Design a protein with these regions (language model features):
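An anion-binding loop in the catalytic cleft
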Residues: 5-104
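Flexible, acidic loop-helix segments that line cofactor/substrate-binding pockets
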Residues: 1-3
Length: 104
C-alpha cells in the first residue's frame, strides 16, 4: 500500500501499524521505495508552510514529515531488499535533507 501524505498523521500512523510487517506501507523518496515500519504522531498544526510529504525536521532518531494534518514522525524504515532499521542507521547510508519530499 502506497502512503497518501495528504491524509492526517493519525490515519497514516494507524495505516503503518495495521500493515506492518506485511504487506507494509510504502513510499518513494529520491527514486527509492521504502516501507515505513514505525511512527508516532505529532498533531502540531503549525506546518502550513510545508507541502504534504515534505521532511520538516531531521534528528538522530526521527524524521518529521508534513501530512494533511499534523506531522508523522518516522522511527523505523525498510529500504527495498534490505532489513528493517532505525531511521538513524538508514540515514548513515541514505542522505535525507529537510525539504525532501516523500511520494516523489
Amino acid at each position: 500500500t502506497i502512503i497518501d501524505w495528504s491524509k492526517p498523521a493519525r490515519e497514516l500512523h494507524n495505516l503503518v501499524r495495521g500493515l506492518t510487517p506485511t504487506p507494509g506501507a510504502a513510499t518513494i523518496i529520491k527514486g527509492k521505495r521504502i516501507k515505513i515500519q514505525e511512527t508516532r504522531v505529532d498533531n502540531d498544526n503549525n506546518g502550513s508552510n510545508y507541502l504534504t510529504g515534505e521532511i520538516t525536521a531531521i534528528k538522530k532518531s526521527i524524521v518529521a514529515v508534513q501530512t494533511g494534518k499534523g506531522f508523522l514522525l518516522i522511527h523505523r524504515v525498510q529500504l527495498e531488499g534490505k532489513k528493517t532499521m532505525d531511521i538513524g542507521s538508514f540515514m548513515n547510508g541514505f542522505t535525507l535533507d529537510i525539504g525532501d519530499r516523500f511520494g516523489n
